[in-house]
Amino acid sequence: MRGPRLPALPALLWLALAPLPGPAARAELRVRVRLPGGQVTEESLQADSGSDCISLELRKADGALITLTADFRQEVKIFRALILGELERGQSQFQALCFVTRLHRNEIIPSESMAKLRQKNPRTVRQAEEVRGLEHLSMDVAVNFSKGAQLSSHIHNVCAEAKEAIYTREEDVKFWLEKGMDGSMFEVLPQTSDLPDLQRCKLCTDRWKPCICSYSLSIEWYPCMLKYCKSRDAAGKVSSYKCGIRSCQKGYTFDYYVPQKQLCLWDEET
């Protein structure tokens, strides 16, 4: 039975925007967060203000390792899931997926601000102050791993285990093509409109038939906005300064084509 959830603590009680040790800093913050089922896990947040990127990593209750990399310089967001395989059903030890989408302004705090975050009480279990709506994304385009560095240099490292399973959306591809990206790195995947017999994997009974797979993940806690406080000097002039962060939680569901249901055994009717 799930116990009562603790109210979110104000960010100002535990996070401080400390000065950076140098002009470009790498920093890591580890926070304890509560998963939807009530379990507590540790989430790692890393920021590199030099390359202008951040990375968040946490383990789901089912053992899957979820990583979100935000590349501010290229306006690219990379989700990676390392999913434990079902060995008794012929799967490998783990399965890797990468979902690449456009990073919009103000989705998450800048890397420079993330690198400054410090925690006053590391044992406290964090809970997001704001729950942002579930985003359901149709990942209808495959990304060529060998050419993906043009999109973001982080794809080479983050998606190394998912070379044949990197997905994005056609609407994001249009945005990147307008920025001058090479279109040869993208391949449009089959859809139900192209193949009338193409089913959702959870409805497909043949493990060797192609289908549309769904995978859901949630970033349970991340700094989504900066908070500003006001101060007044001796002359009475009011000025604003950064004094903390607001935390958010957001869930995602990705739909994408797989050549056989064997690659999507978690998506079954229960």
Swiss-Prot record:
Source organism of the structure: Gallus gallus
The protein's name: Out at first protein homolog
Signal peptide per UniProt: 1-24
Keywords noted in UniProt: Signal
Pfam short name (any one): OAF_N
Transmembrane regions: none
Annotated family: Belongs to the OAF family.
Superkingdom of this protein's organism: Eukaryota
